[in-house]
Amino acid sequence: TFFVRRNVTDVPNTRKLTQLFMDIIAEVKMLQGNDIVQVVHDRLQIVSAPDGIFEEKLRGPVYDENPEATRFMLCSIEAQNQTKEIYADLWARDNNKKYVWTIEHIFPEGENIPASWVQMIADGDAALAKQYRLDYVHTIGNLTITGYNQNLSNMSFDQKRDRKSKDKTKEIGYKNGLYLNKDVVNQNKWTVDKIRNRTDVLVKILMEMYNW
């Protein structure tokens, strides 16, 4: 909880961490067992970002501010809801030591917004689509994870949702069975309202997961 909140909010900031941990080590030196756990918990909670600041950051462009922490949180939500039938090693890395599962922007993040997305997100208004991109593209409600990011990219929403492997035997789009996609897979279009609503859902989950 402490490290997720700290990485998202930068509270306390990095330069204070060394002294914080040194003070905690000194305080628990003569303690044992649960007493150590309690002291560590209490000292970290005192300096941790309060709920209001944490929630505000979660509702903002969280990917733009900290993509690594965002990936960790999304993968943690997914891992908490995995079943034996649908399991994936979300922490696996490829031969280049990069994560196999990466963040996917549902509404594409690139500055050159595809025509299909201008039409869907802003009823054909290119200027409005650009503004929506600035306001919402990096918010958590517009994010999921995928092992096939390069295969989705700037595709239309329908194509991203229904994408299959080349041999047509595997769902590699939003129908891949992930918990994170359960409120995306049945949508016929992706809009700002749906991004906002999904942000509400995911923020609530994260506030509960990383609650003191």
Predicted regions and their residues:
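Flexible coil/loop and intrinsically disordered segments
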Residues: T1-W212
